[in-house]
Amino acid sequence: MSFLSFLLGQKKSSASVAKERLQIILAHERGRGDSPDYLPQLQQELVAVISKYVKIDPEDIKVHLERQDTLEVLEVKIEMPQN
């Protein structure tokens, strides 16, 4: 089935595209070794994407990167409105 999907040009899900972008960003930052300057831009893009589906306040999304030795943890907290 995946070969047919490739030939027919079916779109990737937004989740898989976002995952790939985050992996690229993290790999790039690991190579540089300095502080992550992409976090504000990442937060803005997350607000834009989530706002397409749910009305949220930009302050409801928190992005934090924690580094310990060889481990990096990207933490994203999103407060969803009560419906």
UniProtKB/Swiss-Prot annotation:
Prevents the cell division inhibition by proteins MinC and MinD at internal division sites while permitting inhibition at polar sites. This ensures cell division at the proper site by restricting the formation of a division septum at the midpoint of the long axis of the cell. It comes from Bordetella pertussis (strain Tohama I / ATCC BAA-589 / NCTC 13251). Keywords: Cell cycle, Cell division. InterPro entries: MinE, MinE_sf. The keyword Cell cycle applies. This is Cell division topological specificity factor. GO terms for biological process: cell division; regulation of division septum assembly. Coiled coil: none annotated. Belongs to the MinE family. It comes from the Bacteria. Pfam families: MinE.
